[in-house]
């Protein structure tokens, strides 16, 4: 019997088949005529996609029926649900920018013009010059190396 296959371009191919032929056989015949590999072909008849192992008789395809040929789509992942968070996002710490911050470490005497250090500089070799120690109420502390000097406690 003769069936028609309408391609994507609108071109109609005629194929000579038997009702006992499988969909695989039909796809092989389409490959011979059009050069499209069978694994990329999808045949549709009466709104249903035809499975490879079944025969034309299974789908009630009779003489002069028209099958529609479409190409297989590649890829496409599952759509994911949007995450819902229980806690709000933590606000990032904003760095406080202080202009001329080094002025708080030194004092200039108005009369003599002499510069004196207000903070103690860390003597540790790994810190290097210019690393000042933090003034706490009972100690000096270096934030870089962890060196601590505790003030003398008067009893």
Swiss-Prot record:
Extent of the signal sequence: none
Covalent link location (Glycyl lysine isopeptide (Gly-Lys) (interchain with K-? in acceptor proteins)): 76
Regions that span the bilayer: none
Coiled coil: none
Ranges annotated as C4-type zinc finger: 122-145
GO MF term list: mRNA binding; protein tag activity; structural constituent of ribosome; ubiquitin protein ligase binding; zinc ion binding
Record family assignment: In the N-terminal section; belongs to the ubiquitin family. In the C-terminal section; belongs to the eukaryotic ribosomal protein eS31 family.
Miscellaneous field: Ubiquitin is generally synthesized as a polyubiquitin precursor with tandem head to tail repeats. Often, there are one to three additional amino acids after the last repeat, removed in the mature protein. Alternatively, ubiquitin extension protein is synthesized as a single copy of ubiquitin fused to a ribosomal protein (either eL40 or eS31) or to an ubiquitin-related protein (either RUB1 or RUB2). Following translation, extension protein is cleaved from ubiquitin.
Protein name: Ubiquitin-ribosomal protein eS31 fusion protein
Gene (UniProt): UBF9
